[in-house]
Curated annotation (Swiss-Prot):
InterPro entries listed in its UniProt record: ATP-Sase_PUA-like_dom, PUA-like_sf, Rossmann-like_a/b/a_fold, SO4_adenylyltransferase_pro, Sulfurylase_cat_dom, Sulphate_adenylyltransferase
Keywords, comma-separated and alphabetical: ATP-binding, Nucleotide-binding, Nucleotidyltransferase, Transferase
Name of the coding gene: sat
Protein name as it appears in the record: Sulfate adenylyltransferase
Phylogenetic placement of the source organism: Bacteria, Pseudomonadati, Chlorobiota, Chlorobiia, Chlorobiales
EC class name: transferase
Catalyses which reaction(s): sulfate + ATP + H(+) = adenosine 5'-phosphosulfate + diphosphate
Amino acid sequence: MSLVNPHGKEKVLKPLLLTGEELTAEKARAQSFAQVRLSSRETGDLIMLGIGGFTPLTGFMGHDDWKGSVQDCRMADGTFWPIPITLSTSKEKADELSIGQEVALVDDESGELMGSMVIEEKYSIDKAFECQEVFKTTDPEHPGVLMVMNQGDVNLAGRVKVFSEGTFPTEFAGIYMTPAETRKMFEANGWSTVAAFQTRNPMHRSHEYLVKIAIEVCDGVLIHQLLGKLKPGDIPADVRKECINALMEKYFVKGTCIQGGYPLDMRYAGPREALLHALFRQNFGCSHLIVGRDHAGVGDYYGPFDAHHIFDQIPADALETKPLKIDWTFYCYKCDGMASMKTCPHTAEDRLNLSGTKLRKMLSEGEQVPEHFSRPEVLEILQRYYASLTQKVDIKLHSHAVGK
């Protein structure tokens, strides 16, 4: 059997990253272009366009694709796309630019020239409409809403040429991978069914349990962590990488899973982001996405299994990658092991509810972490990280984190 096809009608990866002489020539040309500065989110999106992670997109979305994606999870040509991929700038900057003009795309933080774009469209959007549809809220306390509300007032659309993957290939060597690379690894392992495990946390016992369930039913698992920006209080990628390596070395059969990483910032869009996670995992070659409790959620904005339900609401042919839905998992003292709501008959008093938020809060406040919460090797790395922090971040416990 072969791997799932890349997303889109043509079913082929479309990486937009230039190489060799073409890259040298286009970078030289772009030196004289007017510059458009990219936010961290936009830079991550551009890199995903570059490596083919956002196949079949060829650039940042125009108005009709933006509206279709926001309102119906479909672009103007009918391609399924659950979250808009857009580039914004100020009205003042947009007024200086004309349709058909080539612009240089520059990462605002590093100043690196990341790519170029031919402007095909300039348009304004209703930000509140986008937030309500995508995030199901316009609350500015929601980090994804804040991101959209703070972006420029004008969107620029057009085909892009990508020059760089930023620091990801060097900073996360051996972890950061392109879709072509993961597909090659899966094929070398003889895998055709591969489950992706999305994570922005070091893996506690529930995460380990979810991955092991997937290993039982698939050929292998891609533990695929987000390498872009998170909200304050979340644990940085280099620490997560060390934790996952320790866990894989001590508690997983070799050859059953691969640790990888991708360059996006977290959007915290809950159910909609779960769909995007499945979509680009299809491009990476994964047949399944593990969807547990409160996937891609934040606070109490989403129900614990809204991300399960949304997959039942999209057309059956929207994605080849399917959800591997797993119920609430926990450690049960009476079962003497990890269990779920489907397998454990005992009461809440017998269970230790596990969540990344709860673990971060305990570590941040120097509390004793219960024995069955995390593997000791992982805990040791996390305790060392928290001991090194000079500034404490206040972490709020939402209801899902405490088992409600």
